[in-house]
Amino acid sequence: MTAQTLPPNIHSTGALPKVKWARGSYLTDVDGKRYIDGSGGPAVYCIGHANQEVNEAITRQLDLIAHGYRYNFTTDALEELADILRGVLGGTLNHIVYVTGGSEAVESCLKLALQYHAAQGQMSRRRFIARERSWHGNTLGALSVSGFLERKTAFEGSLLD
């Protein structure tokens, strides 16, 4: 990654290592140097890179259907996951909405909160609170409720209150 491809809020002190491959919790760069992956995100921390069981499950699903069509159709995989989630969460959920990641999940929750208060006739309840240095995602809505001022500055005027 070069300075031209870095996000504007990230400042590199030099050339970044170029990762060639990864296994488990380790990254290996093009020169063969190994690193513990401290930046891969929650799924990598829990599962690891190149997890054979996960890769095989993904391949099996992709061979059937690559997209879940959550609002127009259902699939065995969607229904099985819903059953697992209901079981883990005590069986009390009536509705499950699948999203692609954390930013979209936060964005959906913000919209749900706004819709709820509008339906209650509480139109003035449109503000959100966040802890300092909190991070909730990359979308404008998720960024709005993040307490990471350095990441918000460039978008002031476009964010939610």
Language-model-detected regions and their locations in the chain:
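N-terminal glycine-rich, Lys/His-bearing helix-loop that initiates the first secondary-structure elements
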Residues: 1-95
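PLP-dependent aspartate aminotransferase-fold enzymes
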Residues: 83-161
